[in-house]
Amino acid sequence: MKILETERLLLRGLEQGDFKDVCKLLQDDEVMYAYEGAFNDQEVQNWLDRQFGRYRHDGFGLWGGGEKGSNELIGQCGITYQEFDGKRVPEIGYLFKKEFWHKGFAIEAAVACREYAFHTLGFEEVYSIIRDTNIASQKVARRNGMQKVATFIKHYRGV
């Protein structure tokens, strides 16, 4: 089901049939360095299950992104609730296959998600939680109108 459309992308809800394509994304060490390493098959399934739960409970989550005119899943972008400063906040997250890095897909998707968060979901503020070493993602966030509000440590895998 299509959620958002941009000039070059379609963002849609993920389905179980996307498992192999999601594996190509989440099992790439270079793509997943900000998450402290690539996922194994079970971790990919757990990640998918979390998205399905988010769709049901929140009405949104991380969506699959594909180029218009192609069925290939090139990344994911969307809105999830994350814990920050003792509260639950909406976060815009994005992750794309490395062959699609530095081509403007992340900012295109992130801007669409920001607009959706404000105008469709009615949020008054959104966040992007980004690893301090992920300079490219920080640049995307700044181009998306984000401002740094805090620095903190978040562990994804106990590292």
Q: Language-model features: where?
A:
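Sparse recognition of residues in long alpha-helices and their boundaries
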Residues: 38-39, 60, 87, 157
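A short helix-loop-beta-strand connector motif used in the catalytic cores of GNAT acetyltransferases and
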Residues: 51-64
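Conserved GNAT-fold acetyl-CoA-binding loop/helix
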Residues: 30-50
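Acyl-donor (CoA/ACP) binding surface of acyl/acetyltransferases
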Residues: 1-33, 66-159
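Secondary-structure boundary/capping residues
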Residues: 31, 40, 57-60, 126
